[in-house]
UniProtKB/Swiss-Prot annotation:
CDD domains: PNP_EcPNPI-like. The active site is at D205. It catalyses: a purine D-ribonucleoside + phosphate = a purine nucleobase + alpha-D-ribose 1-phosphate; a purine 2'-deoxy-D-ribonucleoside + phosphate = a purine nucleobase + 2-deoxy-alpha-D-ribose 1-phosphate. A purine D-ribonucleoside binds at H5, E180, M181, E182, S204, D205. Phosphate binds at G21, R25, R44, R88, V89, G90, S91. Catalyzes the reversible phosphorolytic breakdown of the N-glycosidic bond in the beta-(deoxy)ribonucleoside molecules, with the formation of the corresponding free purine bases and pentose-1-phosphate. This is Purine nucleoside phosphorylase DeoD-type.
Length: 239
């Protein structure tokens, strides 16, 4: 049954959904990597599609920017449409000098300056972590594809234009691999509602050096991340 934000029916979505922030990137992923694609959501322009990858039913849908937006969509997908696994596929900014542009980062955990998980966890700290099997499958898929993926913590920021530049020093000290805006929220939602989640990011810019990838480069390097996500789903089916 349709929700306020998703005009689909039970069965329209696969049990696994890849989720970029940008709905147009969701469309690109569906058209580039999936077969027999059909649109399953267009409310508020947040496009969602379902198709097959190597015969496996998979969905892809945008989640917007920030924890509030992605929390709405992931919650509804899990509780109203039977989704069991969510893989966020997005971009992140690097803060460590040993993390380079175009590196693929697998988010084993996610720190955050948001209070959303403390709200749902009775004002206590919640360890926002990815599902172990999904992490392992993504690592194995990356190796099989010849992609040297980094594995570690992300930082999910509430502010894109943050006034706190000193926080980047703290992130670097604690070994944070990349800064983005959603992983901690998605991991919290998955934990609350009994689903599994993973975030895979491509480093699109470096906060320290101010380097950035071009639009053309992002198209190519982001595809490596999508292939890892898709192949990891197939590996998960073999368990």
């Amino acid at each position: 049954m349709a929700t306020p934000h998703i005009n689909a029916e039970m069965g329209d979505f696969a049990d696994v959904v890849l989720m970029p922030g940008d709905p147009l990137r969701a469309k690109h992923i569906a058209e580039t990597f999936l077969e027999d694609v059909r649109e399953v959501n267009n409310v508020r322009g947040m496009l969602g599609f379902t198709g097959t990858y190597k015969g496996r039913k998979i969905s892809v849908m945008g989640h917007g920017m920030g924890i509030p937006s992605c929390s709405i969509y992931t919650k509804e997908l899990i509780t109203d449409f039977g989704v069991k696994k969510i893989i966020r596929v997005g971009s992140c900014g690097a803060v460590r000098m040993d993390v380079k542009l175009r590196d693929v980062v697998i988010g084993m955990g996610a720190c955050t300056d948001s209070k959303v998980n403390r709200i749902r966890f009775k004002d206590h700290d919640f360890a926002a972590i990815a599902d172990f099997d999904m992490v392992r499958n993504a690592v194995d898929a990356a190796k099989a594809l010849g992609v040297d993926a980094r594995v570690g913590n992300l930082f999910s920021a509430d502010l894109f234009y943050s006034p706190d530049g000193e926080m980047f020093d703290v992130m670097e000290k604690y070994g944070v691999l990349g800064v983005e805006m959603e992983a901690a929220g998605i991991y919290g939602v998955a934990a609350e509602f009994g689903a599994k989640a993973l975030t895979i990011c491509t480093v699109s810019d470096h906060i320290r050096t101010h380097e950035q990838t071009t639009a053309a480069e992002r198209q190519t390097t982001f595809n490596d991340m999508i292939k890892i996500a898709l192949e990891s789903v197939l590996l998960g089916d073999q368990e």
